[in-house]
Regions:
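C-terminal "post-core" interaction segments
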Residues: 1-168
Length: 168
């Protein structure tokens, strides 16, 4: 039998106490994947150009896995078992979401500032988008490529951070 016969769809109804959303800024990096991308992609059919990806392109993982153990030889298989789509049946973002978004704003991942600090580059770009101000789009090359792997480093490391890589 076809596995597609086991597909399930879930629809959410509007709630009377819901706040009407006018614009949403999603902050992401090359390390944003899977569930984060699922949330962003799920909003595109409903909010369209009122959403923006802030930061850099996402990882590009519109699939999920299941684990299957083989006790005979102590192996574990990670099987790609499902692909995620939104209400418009869009789900081919294997190179990240930047090329699928109507609006993007390039910003550095400023790990030297506290989460939520309006002076942090990604937060500032997100607030600018929400206020209707212009921003620099995520560049074409970074919009097409997946995650850039590498150690996160502060822009201006302290003496201790310089000596001990990975210290925050």
């Amino acid at each position: 039998p076809e596995k597609s016969s086991e597909n399930e769809s879930y629809s959410l109804r509007a709630q009377s106490q819901a706040v009407p959303v006018t614009r949403v800024a999603f902050i992401g990096t090359g390390a944003s994947a899977s569930a984060s991308e699922m949330v962003i992609n799920g909003q595109l059919p409903f909010l369209g150009a009122a959403t923006a990806l802030i930061g850099s392109n996402t990882y590009g993982k519109p699939v999920g896995q299941i684990a299957r153990d083989r006790s005979v030889c102590d192996d574990r298989f990670r099987i790609v078992a499902f692909r995620v789509e939104n209400a418009s049946r869009q789900g081919d973002y294997y190179t990240g979401l930047a090329s699928k978004m109507a609006s993007t704003c390039q910003a550095a991942d400023d790990i030297g500032r506290p989460l939520g600090d309006p002076a942090e580059a990604s937060m500032r770009a997100g607030l600018d988008f929400l206020a209707g101000r212009a921003c620099t789009p995520i560049s074409g090359q970074s919009a097409r490529s997946g995650a850039n792997r590498g150690l996160l480093r502060p822009t201006k490391p302290s003496a201790a951070q310089y000596q001990l890589e990975g210290l925050f």
